[in-house]
Amino acid sequence: GEFTRLMMEETGATGPWAGFNVMLAANMLREAAAMTTQISGEIIPSDKPGTLAMAIRQPAGVCLGIAPWNAPVILGTRALAMPLACGNTVVLKASEMCPGTHRLIGQVLVEIGRAS
């Protein structure tokens, strides 16, 4: 597809290697999506009688992802997948050597309503 073609053009990767990277990136996204059902808080026994302590998991806020040029699809996706799944905002610093690949990742996120 388009990710494979762009990775081949921008990095000089072979078709099979680029396709493998796209497959790995898709698997990372599936794994991150599955993790969203497992993010929860905990109730912890307290030293004080009659009370409970709670640990609440919440987003960290704004995260920075730095995506290098050598494997832009998989490394760009890795920088985004888990932070987004945990409810964070992510700013991706894309490599100037492969802007098309990282731009396409952003376009896909906009299309599915996960970025603006």
Q: Model-derived features: where do they sit?
A:
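Rossmann-like NAD(P) dinucleotide-binding subdomain of oxidoreductase/dehydrogenase enzymes
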Residues: 41-116
